[in-house]
Amino acid sequence: MTMYNIQDHVVIITGSSSGIGLAASTLALASGAKVLGIDISNSPASLTANPNYTFFAADLSHPESAKKAIAACIAAYGNRIDGLLNIAGVMDLNQSADTVTDDMWDRCIAINLTAPVKLMREVIPIMRLRGKGSIVNVGSKASMSGAVSGVAYTASKHGLVGATKNVAWRFKHEGIRCNIVCPGGVAATGIRDGVDSTQFDSEAMEMMTVIHQAHASDHAKGLGLQPEDLAHSLLYFLSDLSKGISGAVIPVDNAWSTI
């Protein structure tokens, strides 16, 4: 299947071991791409035997992870990077500005904002040499709203929108596109892994209940999104099928972004 015209393209995908990242990696490989997958978890068993898949284990909150990941990609596939999918992310505990801990703030900003920017910093010089490249960041409903998550997650995802738009404008004349896809709640993403639900800011959660319920009803009606649904959106914006689209903020949430 080559429906996305990425045959032999070299694509870096973060969060590749589960959820949206795994679905996107699987679809990219099926479309003929060569993928460097990055994750803090183990390499996904379903992809390990694929000769076009290289796995790089990394905690993206570490300062040198981005640089080392790009070096691993070059070692595997040469000095060519066609695409970057910044998918890896972590949730907060819905903590408000008056309750957020330093650790929670630092981790959300490090993984959800700093790591994507560092990876873009590393791949853009390679893309500039080729005169072409496509970057797709993964945001959230929280990229456009202050009423769905805590202050750390919200700030990190708002910041990623700004970084996306800046990259899109700055490199628009060099064939490099940058967009951000903003999912709503997606089943089996793994983004809540390691989150202690008993530590959620219950007062803040109560304020957001009506917003969350509006989206939860989609799943109850069988309209909820799966990781594979997001993978198709991501591959579309990564590929030349979306030529001319850059700096866009694209909600993929069954209209949740309208409220």
Curated annotation (Swiss-Prot):
GO terms for biological process: terpenoid biosynthetic process. Disulfide bonds: none annotated. Coiled coil: none annotated. It comes from the Eukaryota. Keywords: NADP, Oxidoreductase. SUPFAM superfamilies: NAD(P)-binding Rossmann-fold domains. NADP(+) binds at residues 13, 59, 121, 153, 157, 186. It is an enzyme of class 1 (oxidoreductase). Its EC number is 1.1.1.-. GO terms for molecular function: oxidoreductase activity. InterPro entries: NAD(P)-bd_dom_sf, SDR_fam, SDR_superfamily_enzyme. Pathway: Secondary metabolite biosynthesis; terpenoid biosynthesis. It holds the Pfam family adh_short. The active site is at residues 153, 157. PANTHER family: DIHYDROANTICAPSIN 7-DEHYDROGENASE. Short chain dehydrogenase; part of the gene cluster A that mediates the biosynthesis of the fungal meroterpenoid acetoxydehydroaustin. The first step of the pathway is the synthesis of 3,5-dimethylorsellinic acid by the polyketide synthase ausA. 3,5-dimethylorsellinic acid is then prenylated by the polyprenyl transferase ausN. Further epoxidation by the FAD-dependent monooxygenase ausM and cyclization by the probable terpene cyclase ausL lead to the formation of protoaustinoid A. In A.calidoustus, the austinoid gene cluster lies on a contiguous DNA region, while clusters from E.nidulans and P.brasilianum are split in their respective genomes. Genetic rearrangements provoked variability among the clusters and E.nidulans produces the least number of austionoid derivatives with the end products austinol and dehydroaustinol, while P.brasilianum can produce until acetoxydehydroaustin, and A.calidoustus produces the highest number of identified derivatives. Belongs to the short-chain dehydrogenases/reductases (SDR) family. This is Short chain dehydrogenase ausX. It comes from Penicillium brasilianum. The gene is ausX.
